[in-house]
Amino acid sequence: MLAKKQIQGLPPYAPGKPIEDVKREYGLETVIKMASNENPYGASPAVAKAIADGASKTFLYPDGYGTALRKALAAKHKVDEGQLILGNGTDEVIQLLCRSFLTPETNTVMATPSFSQYKLNATIEGATIKEITVKEDGSHDLDAMLAAIDDQTRIVWVCNPNNPNGVALGEAELKTFLDAVPTTCLVVVDEAYYEYVELDDFPNSVALLNAYPQLVVLRTFSKAYGLAGLRVGYGISQREIARQIEPVRLPFNNNILAHTAALAALEDEAFIAACKQKNSVEKAKLRAFFEARGMFVFPSETNFLLVETGIPGDVVFQAFLENGFILRSGEALGYPTAIRISIGNEAENDAFIEKAPEILDQLRASLGA
């Protein structure tokens, strides 16, 4: 028996090697992971206490509606609880949107390169995918995306800041785009890296929800909040959009400890502010290192940098892996001669900067680059 045709040939997600496997394979004592854009400072100390306190309740099913977390998020964003869509990470919210609004008779518009889950989930639903190449500076080509919208377009995806290059759109650009998109087409603005943004005119997207009924804003606890291992994400939309999606959401899609941890993380605003400040300092340090060596670094508003090395990304990835640094090759991200590097903590970044010149020089010598 064959699966439905749109998923035949789809490759499964390929996770990176665990740190312990890398140590064993290459005989390393220390391995620094700078690949998945996790928070190198972990989560708020309040999270560990909340999880410990909640561990005795794991025999219970979680609150399937996530009532306490909804109330806290609604208060934070000044929206109604009914405007929230809770997901097992924003990956699930993306899946729910595609399942709810896309069919083989419809199409969806997205930038490329961008976050891969938009295309994957749209493909599974059989929708036609219209990919619009980003501009040379890495930003979304909103004019071209607008031109691609037709009567059958149901979702337009705007990853802001964009993953994998970190480039962000300003509020004026986004509002001009939203003004032109028909209300029959959702505009999903994925703000996974919102807490790291320093751009002065970055959109206050949640505040735009009342003016633009087609707008959906995505946020996550996986990045700055340091809860990647617990999988909590959410969407904010008009009540009617959230109402239509709710029946598609699996019951108990967030576990009981995830709810508890997210609540604790949300309350510790000082921790998030400190992480943002340290990320800014360390990002500037890594950027200066790469630029001093003549490499182009995309202007990132996130906790990662996309760096054009001029060497095939898989080759650079392998060389650093053998020396104890797990990076992300740009070859699978749409940037074949780039690497994406997550911003580590001070010690991790200093270790990288100390070792990287030797690795890069050896690579260039071996390739005659």
From Swiss-Prot:
Q: Which InterPro entries match?
A: Aminotrans_II_pyridoxalP_BS, Aminotransferase_I/II_large, HisP_aminotrans, HistidinolP_aminotransfase, PyrdxlP-dep_Trfase, PyrdxlP-dep_Trfase_major, PyrdxlP-dep_Trfase_small
Q: Which domain of life is it from?
A: Bacteria
Any one GO molecular function term:
pyridoxal phosphate binding
Question: Catalysed reaction(s)?
Answer: L-histidinol phosphate + 2-oxoglutarate = 3-(imidazol-4-yl)-2-oxopropyl phosphate + L-glutamate
Check the record and name the PROSITE patterns matching this protein: AA_TRANSFER_CLASS_2
Give the pathway. Amino-acid biosynthesis; L-histidine biosynthesis; L-histidine from 5-phospho-alpha-D-ribose 1-diphosphate: step 7/9
Question: N6-(pyridoxal phosphate)lysine (modified residue): where?
Answer: 223
Give the GO terms filed under biological process for this record: L-histidine biosynthetic process
Q: List the disulfide bonds.
A: none
Tell me which EC number(s) this protein carries. 2.6.1.9
Kindly state the subunit structure of this protein.
Homodimer.
> Cross-referenced HAMAP family, in alphabetical order?
HisC_aminotrans_2
The family assignment reads: Belongs to the class-II pyridoxal-phosphate-dependent aminotransferase family. Histidinol-phosphate aminotransferase subfamily.
Q: What is this protein called?
A: Histidinol-phosphate aminotransferase
Lineage, uppermost ranks: Bacteria, Bacillati, Bacillota, Bacilli, Bacillales
- Identify the coding gene: hisC
